[in-house]
Swiss-Prot record:
Entry protein name: dTTP/UTP pyrophosphatase
Protein purpose: Nucleoside triphosphate pyrophosphatase that hydrolyzes dTTP and UTP. May have a dual role in cell division arrest and in preventing the incorporation of modified nucleotides into cellular nucleic acids.
Signal peptide positions (record): none
Keywords: Cytoplasm, Hydrolase, Nucleotide metabolism
NCBIfam families per the UniProt record, alphabetical: maf
CDD domains: Maf
Primary residence: cytoplasm
Reactions accelerated catalytically: dTTP + H2O = dTMP + diphosphate + H(+); UTP + H2O = UMP + diphosphate + H(+)
Pfam family, one: Maf
Annotated organism of origin: Ralstonia nicotianae (strain ATCC BAA-1114 / GMI1000) (Ralstonia solanacearum)
Cysteine disulfide links: none
Lineage: Bacteria, Pseudomonadati, Pseudomonadota, Betaproteobacteria, Burkholderiales
């Protein structure tokens, strides 16, 4: 008997985040990673523009990631399939909290969020196989318990804050800090599944 060929991926995922990969698998999406080359300047892509609001920022960066991924797919001569990108940012008041530069920066962010509510914004872009972009935005509110300096120091020592917007991951040890959330848990993790599934349906992707 001939072996059954593996089904084609539904889309390209232009993200190296293990959390986004896990969430896509959770809803049955088959994907192929479409990661950036070493010469692509991700830091320049994520720079905040003067006067930019957190909502505008996260949507602009997500759309730019999608444009870069589409160029990457074309340059590599890959088959035309939809592309999915996502970007998450945390904001406290009007301040955008990106990925911490170091332990001191992580401490500053966590201390600022202690006992307070902050917003987590995750933008999603799906570019269809014919190049049509579609966008969605998930906004959630998260309230932290009051954190002691010991709480913060232990969390930073775990290494978990680094590489994460707002210096924490809700799916990890920081779950113990979260007193209340309103919104999308998967969006806080990095990919809002309700909004993502709606975009995939618009792109005629059947899961």
């Amino acid at each position: 008997m001939e072996p059954t060929a593996a089904p084609h991926p539904h889309l390209y995922l232009a993200s190296q985040s293990p959390r986004r990969q896990e969430l896509l698998r959770q809803i049955g999406v088959r994907f192929e990673l479409l990661l950036a080359d070493g010469d692509e300047d991700a830091e320049a892509l994520e720079a905040v523009l003067l006067g930019e609001t957190p909502d505008d920022y996260v949507q602009r960066v997500c759309a730019l990631k999608a444009q870069a991924a589409a160029r990457r797919r074309a340059a590599r001569g890959l088959p035309a399939r939809p592309i999915l990108t996502s970007d998450t940012t945390v904001c406290l008041g009007g301040e955008i909290l990106g990925k911490p530069a170091d332990a001191a920066d992580a401490h500053r962010m966590l201390r600022g969020m202690s006992g307070r509510e902050h917003r987590v914004l995750t933008a999603v872009t799906v570019v269809t196989a014919d190049g049509t972009p579609m966008h969605a935005l998930s906004v959630s509110q998260v309230r932290f318990a009051v954190l002691t300096d010991v709480d913060i120091a232990r969390y930073i020592a775990s290494g978990e804050p680094f590489g994460k917007a707002g210096a924490y991951g809700i799916q990890g040890r920081a779950a113990a800090f979260v007193a209340h959330i309103s919104g999308s848990y998967s969006g806080i993790m990095g990919l809002p599944l309700f909004e993502t599934a709606a975009l995939l349906a618009q792109a005629a992707i059947t899961l």
